[in-house]
């Protein structure tokens, strides 16, 4: 494969990963609403833990109206802040009302960003042409007229299209289930998780289809396909017993983080360092899906994150053992296959650190969790190697120049006299950045720094008045473009960086 083809494939991979990140940014902030709806449905509907006719009436409107509107608002807000979100929610009512018996999550995921983009373009056209003194009139009427038009478009045009798409997808899923072929989906899902497509598959396909199934059947097996912690646990237990060196030593902590914390990316490097282990996770995933399919098991709401604790909380009444069996059998099969591979195949020269770098490169960004598998010296060496790699294309080189211009790795080069707010930013604004912000808050508390607030957010939601932004190096250029007037600091990983101690000294 030529260098040009390699760069094109790499660019395509990053675009797909970015698309998955955008879908995640619409769904993940609303997972709490899914969980609240799931609790209400699991507890109060007929056949629930404590059936209650009055309270069970909450479940239908929540999944039919509330959650699609929240998703549409989130999608519109990502494109054009609150104004885009509000009109996106208004327009989505057209799709919802046209198909009241089908949870319009997919429709909301399309309408939200689309209307947000249209609102942005409308404002860009109208605002420069608005007479002085008529700003409020033009702003309100332009938004109202766009909402009016797009609501009708949603009702008359998008709704029939979505009805057809949902029908085809539902038939495909049902056909796989009835033919007992749904486990074959793991052949795609498990490798995709380890590369970069997990967000696009889980939040773009399984969550909306699962919500549709759960609304009609009371539960959905689709919520278990990507989230089952069993295959990853089997891999890590195999390393605990048959692994060597760093991989064996770190597998114990990784197992806890993965199984109880639900952060699956922690086991990805262990698979990448022995590519034959893809077979183990695929067979483990297929086993879990087959088990749940045979037992007719499913969840009422998304199991996010994919933690065994979440699985226990989501398990329907009377089906706790079925839930455990699906996780256990998936872990056992994955463990057996992984153990055979580790025991009887030749160990490659590639180590855990190199595999971690490969995973991060394929995802197009650093991982704060998997970076715990690497020490300070290895991280610094990785950073140096990455910055001097001959495979970097012109775009990456321009990104490096941008970071140099902002002096993102020299903490002492900036003036912190007016800084009272530090923001950690990542793709979705919920996972790694939340852990980094929590860690820095603890450091500030121990150092007696009480007048500096530390929060986290998604990069595309950084406020325009941000003062100090901390991002992983691969994402810093995006943060700079979002808020060019802020101080930007790059770190190799959120949980382990010498930059924090330097920052403490400057803020004291």
From Swiss-Prot:
The active site is at residue 426. It holds the Pfam family PTS_EIIC. It catalyses: D-mannitol(out) + N(pros)-phospho-L-histidyl-[protein] = D-mannitol 1-phosphate(in) + L-histidyl-[protein]. GO terms for biological process: phosphoenolpyruvate-dependent sugar phosphotransferase system. Its main location: membrane. GO terms for molecular function: kinase activity; protein-N(PI)-phosphohistidine-mannitol phosphotransferase system transmembrane transporter activity; protein-phosphocysteine-sugar phosphotransferase activity. Residues 355-400 are annotated as: Disordered. Residues 367-392 have a biased composition (Low complexity). The keyword Transmembrane helix applies. The modification Phosphocysteine is found at residue 426. InterPro entries: PTS_EIIB-like_sf, PTS_EIIB_2, PTS_EIIB_2/3, PTS_EIIB_mannitol, PTS_EIIC, PTS_EIIC_2, PTS_IIC_mtl, Sugar_PTS. Keywords: Cell membrane, Kinase, Membrane, Phosphoprotein, Phosphotransferase system, Sugar transport, Transferase, Transmembrane, Transmembrane helix, Transport. It comes from the Bacteria. It is an enzyme of class 2 (transferase). Its EC number is 2.7.1.197. CDD domains: PTS_IIB_mannitol. Residues 53-56, 164-172, 301-320 are extracellular. Residues 19-351 form the PTS EIIC type-2 domain. One of its GO terms (cellular component) is plasma membrane. The chain crosses the membrane at residues 31-52, 57-77, 142-163, 173-193, 281-300, 321-342. Homodimer. PANTHER family: MANNITOL PERMEASE IIC COMPONENT, PTS SYSTEM MANNITOL-SPECIFIC EIICBA COMPONENT. The EIIC type-2 domain forms the PTS system translocation channel and contains the specific substrate-binding site. The PTS EIIB type-2 domain is phosphorylated by phospho-EIIA on a cysteinyl residue. Then, it transfers the phosphoryl group to the sugar substrate concomitantly with the sugar uptake processed by the PTS EIIC type-2 domain. This is PTS system mannitol-specific EIICB component.
């Amino acid at each position: 494969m030529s260098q040009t083809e390699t760069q094109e494939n790499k660019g395509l991979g990053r675009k797909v990963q970015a698309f998955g990140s955008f879908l995640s940014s619409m769904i993940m902030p609303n997972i709490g609403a899914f969980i609240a709806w799931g609790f209400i449905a699991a507890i109060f509907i007929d056949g629930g833990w404590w059936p209650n006719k009055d309270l069970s009436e909450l479940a239908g409107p929540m999944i039919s109206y509330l959650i699609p509107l929240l998703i549409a608002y989130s999608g519109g807000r990502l494109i054009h802040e609150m104004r885009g979100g509000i009109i996106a929610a208004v327009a989505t009512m057209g799709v919802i009302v046209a198909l009241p018996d089908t949870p319009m999550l997919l429709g909301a995921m399309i309408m939200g960003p689309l209307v947000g983009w249209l609102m942005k373009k409308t404002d860009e056209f109208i605002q420069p042409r608005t007479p002085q003194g008529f700003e409020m009139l033009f702003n309100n009427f332009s938004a109202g007229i766009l909402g009016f038009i797009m609501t009708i478009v949603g009702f008359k045009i998008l709704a029939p299209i979505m009805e057809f798409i949902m029908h085809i997808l539902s038939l495909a899923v049902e056909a796989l289930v009835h033919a007992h072929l749904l486990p074959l989906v793991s052949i795609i899902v498990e490798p995709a998780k380890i590369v970069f497509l997990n967000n696009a598959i889980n939040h773009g396909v399984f969550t909306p289809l699962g919500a549709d199934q759960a609304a009609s059947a009371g539960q959905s097996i689709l919520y278990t396909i990507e989230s089952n912690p069993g295959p990853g646990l089997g891999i890590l237990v195999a390393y605990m017993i048959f692994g060597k060196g760093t991989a064996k030593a770190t597998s114990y902590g990784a197992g806890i983080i993965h199984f109880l914390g639900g952060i699956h990316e922690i086991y990805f490097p262990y698979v990448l360092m022995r590519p034959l282990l893809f077979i183990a996770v695929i067979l483990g995933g297929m086993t879990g899906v087959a088990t749940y399919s045979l037992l007719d098991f499913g969840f009422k709401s998304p199991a996010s994150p994919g933690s065994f604790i979440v699985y226990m909380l989501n398990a329907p009444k009377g089906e706790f053992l079925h839930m455990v069996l699906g996780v256990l059998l998936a872990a056992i099969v994955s463990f057996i296959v992984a153990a055979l591979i580790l025991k009887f195949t030749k160990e490659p020269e590639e180590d855990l650190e190199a595999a971690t770098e490969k995973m991060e490169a394929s995802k197009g960004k650093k991982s704060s969790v998997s970076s715990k598998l690497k020490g300070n010296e290895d991280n610094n060496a990785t950073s140096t190697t990455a910055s001097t790699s001959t495979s970097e294309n012109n775009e990456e080189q321009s990104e490096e120049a941008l970071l140099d211009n902002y002096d993102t790795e020299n903490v002492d080069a900036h003036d912190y006299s007016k800084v009272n707010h530090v923001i950690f930013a990542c793709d979705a604004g919920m996972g790694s950045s939340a852990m980094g912000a929590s860690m820095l808050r603890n450091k500030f508390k121990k150092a007696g720094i009480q007048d500096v607030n530390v929060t986290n957010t998604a990069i595309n939601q950084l406020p325009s008045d941000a003062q100090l932004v901390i991002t992983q190096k691969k994402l810093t250029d995006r943060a700079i473009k979002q808020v060019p007037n802020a101080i930007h600091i790059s770190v190799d990983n959120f949980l382990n960086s010498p930059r924090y101690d330097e920052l403490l000294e400057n803020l004291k």
